Amino acid sequence: MAESIEWVEKYRPQSLTDIVGNKKSVVDMREWAQSWLSGTPEKRAIILHGPAGVGKTSAAHALARDLDWETIELNASDQRTAGVIERVAGSASKMSSLTGTTAKRLIILDEADNIHGNADRGGARAIGGIIKNTDQPIVLIANDLYGLTPSVRSLCIELKFNSVQGRSMIPAMKRICVEEKIMCGVGVLEKLAESAGGDLRSAIKDLQAVATGRDEIHIEDIATSERDTKESIFKVLGKIFKSTDPKKALEATYGLDETPENLIHWIDENLPLQYGTEEGTQEDLITGYEYLAKADRYLGRVRKRQSYRLWRYAGALMTCGTVVSKTHVGRGFTKYQPPSFWRKMGQLRAKRDMRDNIASKIADHANKSMRYSRTDLAHLYGRMLEENEYAADVTFDLELSIDEMVYLTGKKKVTKDIQRIHDLAQAKRRSLGRDEGKAFFEKKPKKQTPDKKQMDLTQIINSTPQEDKVEKKETENVPPVKKSASKAKPQKTLFDF
C-alpha cells in the first residue's frame, strides 16, 4: 500500500476540537483569539512552546480555520532577517484582509526560538517591534521558551503544550486505521504510543511506516528498538539537586542535549537557589562551588588544548560533585532559572549589533568608514537628534528606528520627544517617499534666476581657495569666443582611439 502523502498532513486537525491533549492551552488560545474580535487586546501575541510533535503548529492553523482568518507563516526554511520579517510579517500586520473584509490575518512564526546566526541577523529584534505595533494577531511557536529573548516573552502570553499522553494518542491512531481500512489491535497502538515518548507526530509516522504494504498489523511487525529521547534540562537539574546517588545524576545527563560548557552555567545559576537557603547549609554551597571550580578547570583545558576527552571529567565533577556536596536533600519545589550569563551576553550582543547597524547607516550617509562613523560621528548625530531643527530630518535620512534613536541619544527609554520626532519622520516618508527626500543638511533652492557667481552649499564645502584662484585666473586669461554658425569639431586625442 503506497501513499503519496504523509498521514501527518492528511489527518492534520482541521479544528481546535480535533487537537489531541493540552485542552487548557487550547481553551486559552480560543479566548485570546476571541478578544481580537472586540478590539486589540493588551497582549497582541502568544507563544506556543513545548516539545516537538505535540500539535503547536496544527493548533495555530486550526485556530485560523475556526475563525475564518487568513494565515501568513514564516518557518525555519525561510530567511528571517530583520528586513524579511518587517517586509512580510510587518506589512501583513498592518494591511487588511485580501478579501477586503474585516477578518483578521493570523501571522504564524514557526521555530521562533531558532532565529540566530548570520542568515537571520536582526530577526529577533524585529519580532519585538512588530508585536508592539501590530494590528493583527501573532502566534510564535517554539520548542525552547528560553530561546526567545526576555523582551519578546514579556510582550506575549505563554501557553505550554505538554507531551501527549499515550492513552490520548490511541483514539487518534485508531481513527486513522479505520479511514485507511487497516486491521490493528489495541496492543499495537499502545506499543506505538509508548515508543513515541509523547510525540504524536512521530507515533503517526511510525504507524504509517509499519502499515505500508499491509492490510493488518500485528505486534510482531513493530520494531523493538526504542526511540532516542532527549531529557529536559529542568528534569536533569531536578535529578542533580534532589538525588543522593551520584551515578544516577551522571546518567541523567547522557540524554541531555547540552554540552558541559552549557550545563555548568545552569548548575552555577541554580546552585544558590537549592543550597544555602536554609540554616546550616552554607557549607553545602561552598563545597558545591569548589567542585564547579574544578570542573571549570577541565573545561578551560578543553578550550586550550582542544582535547574533548576531558569533557567526561568536567561532567562528572559538576554533577557528581554537586550531589555529594549536600548534607541533606531539600523537598520543596524549586523554580530553576536559565543562566543570567546568557542573558547578559545576549544584551551585549544586541547592543553591539545596534551600534554597528547605526554606524553602517551613518557611514553610507556621510560617505565615511564604519570605524570613523562609530567612533567620531555617532555622538554628533546623537547631538543633532536633540536639536528640533534637524532631528526629524536626521531620523528620516538615516531611517532610524525608535530603539536606534534611544541608543543614539543615550536615553534609557522612549521619551515623548523621541516618539514625536519618529512620527514626524514617518509622516515625511509616507508623504514624499524615500527617494524624494532631501538630506537634512541640504536646503531647497529658491525659484529665481540662477546667478552664475552663486554656489550652493555642497559646492562651497567641496571647493578650496586654491581651486577658486585657478578658476578665476583661467577665466581672466581666456579671450571671448566668437559665436559661429557651426561648432568647431573637437580635436581627437590618443584616448579617443
Curated annotation (Swiss-Prot):
Residues 428-455, 466-476 have a biased composition (Basic and acidic residues). The keyword Nucleotide-binding applies. One of its GO terms (biological process) is DNA replication. It holds the Pfam family AAA. One of its GO terms (molecular function) is ATP binding. ATP binds at G50, P51, A52, G53, V54, G55, K56, T57. InterPro entries: AAA+_ATPase, ATPase_AAA_core, P-loop_NTPase, Rep_factor-C_lsu, RFC_lid. Residues 456-465 have a biased composition (Polar residues). The keyword Disulfide bond does not apply. Keywords: ATP-binding, DNA replication, Nucleotide-binding. Residues 428-497 are annotated as: Disordered. NCBIfam families: PRK04195.1-4 (NF003228), PRK04195.1-5 (NF003229), PRK04195.2-1 (NF003231). Belongs to the activator 1 small subunits family. RfcL subfamily. Part of the RFC clamp loader complex which loads the PCNA sliding clamp onto DNA. PANTHER family: CHROMOSOME TRANSMISSION FIDELITY FACTOR 18, REPLICATION FACTOR C SUBUNIT 1. HAMAP family: RfcL. Heteromultimer composed of small subunits (RfcS) and large subunits (RfcL). This is Replication factor C large subunit.
